[in-house]
Amino acid sequence: MIKSDVQLDAKGLACPMPIVKTKKAMGNLTEGQVLEIQATDKGSVADLAAWSKTVGHQYIGTNEENGVFYHYIRKCNPEVSEAVEKSFEQTISNEGAIKEEGIILDVREAAEYAFGHIPGAKSIPMGELSERMNELDKAQTIYVICRTGTRSDLAAQQLAKAGFTN
C-alpha cells in the first residue's frame, strides 16, 4: 500500500470528472504531498497518468482492488505545472472531420469505441497512444476525438511533443 497524504473519492464518476476533481484537490496540496484518487472509471487509468505528466506532477502508479482503481499522484513544483499545461482548441466538428482528408483518431477506451464511433475513425485508446504512435502518419492531418475533449486535448499535446504538426 502506498502512503498518501490526502484521499479523493471519485468513484462512480466518468470522464472528465475524475481529472476535474483531481486538479482541484492538487491545488490544495503542498509540493511533495501524495494524493490518492479512488475511481471506478476504467478510463481514469490512462487519463490521470497522462494528465499528471502533462501538468508536471509525478504519477506514482495505480492499484486495483474490487473494481476500484487507487491512483497515486505526487504534487510537484507548481511553477513547472503551470508552464507545461497547454490546451488545444477544437478545430473541426465531428461531421466536418468525416468529410475532410486525414485521420480521425479516437482516443476513447475500446468499450466506448465499440458502443459508437465516427465511421472510419482509428481507435487508439489514450493509454496506448505513446506505444502506438508509429501507426500514425506525421504527414497526414490528424483529428483527435474523445467523448468530452479532455483525453483528446491530452492526446494532441502528446502528439505535438512527438513531432506531429498536423
Residue ranges and their predicted role:
Residues 3-10, 28-30, 53-54, 58-115:
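Flexible, polar/low-complexity N-terminal or interdomain linker segments that lie immediately upstream
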Residues 12-22, 39-47, 146-152:
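Short, thiol/selenol-centered motifs that function as redox-active sites or metal-ligating centers
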Residues 22-24, 127-135:
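Short internal alpha-helix immediately C-terminal to a glycine-rich phosphate-binding loop
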Residues 28-38:
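Short glycine-rich, basic-tinged beta-strand/loop micro-motifs
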Residues 42, 133-166:
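Catalytic cysteine-centered active loop of the rhodanese-like fold, especially the PTP/DSP P-loop
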Residues 55-61, 121-126, 163-166:
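Short hydrophobic/aromatic-enriched beta-strand-loop microsegments
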Residues 113-119, 136:
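Short loop/helix-cap segments at secondary-structure boundaries that form the rim of catalytic
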